[in-house]
């Protein structure tokens, strides 16, 4: 790993290739970092282009971080990316208190989390259908 305190300096460091990397271990590492930076920039441009192709989507629930992530995934799928697997994350399930209300498992923190998951997935599937790309996703 590496720590970057100033992104502008890092950008200049990896893109300023007036001086070739020295023929040393550090030079090999510098060449690797420069190449990864170039590839990341190219991949970023492809992702931006795919995202820009989508101008309308069906509605998603608000205040739902999983729905926000799935909305982006739907845009990238519709935008033409050939990515086979997208990874999203929705935490908060490791609770040990107030998971449900005694006598009613449909009320409580855990029930709310599961409701958010359900609403996010439904919105995602509805959006894929709206976009005409539902056949590109395995349920």
Where do the PLM segments sit?
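Feature for exported/extracytoplasmic and membrane-associated proteins, marking the mature portion
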Residues: 1-119, 123-130
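His/Asp/Glu-rich metal/cofactor-coordinating catalytic motifs and the adjacent surface-exposed loops
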Residues: 133
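Acidic/histidine-rich, metal-coordinating catalytic segments
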Residues: 136-139
């Amino acid at each position: 790993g590496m720590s970057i305190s100033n992104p502008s300096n890092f950008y200049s460091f990896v893109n300023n290739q007036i001086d070739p990397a020295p023929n040393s271990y550090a030079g090999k590492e510098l060449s690797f970092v420069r190449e990864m930076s170039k590839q990341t920039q190219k991949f970023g441009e492809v992702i931006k282009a795919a995202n820009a192709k989508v101008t309308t989507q069906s509605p998603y629930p608000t205040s739902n971080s999983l729905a926000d992530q799935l909305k982006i995934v739907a845009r990238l799928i519709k935008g033409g990316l050939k990515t086979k697997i997208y990874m999203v994350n929705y935490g908060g399930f490791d609770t040990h208190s107030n998971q449900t209300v005694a006598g009613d498992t449909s009320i409580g923190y855990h029930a709310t989390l599961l409701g958010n998951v359900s609403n996010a997935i439904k919105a995602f599937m509805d959006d894929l259908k709206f976009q005409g790309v539902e056949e590109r996703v395995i349920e």
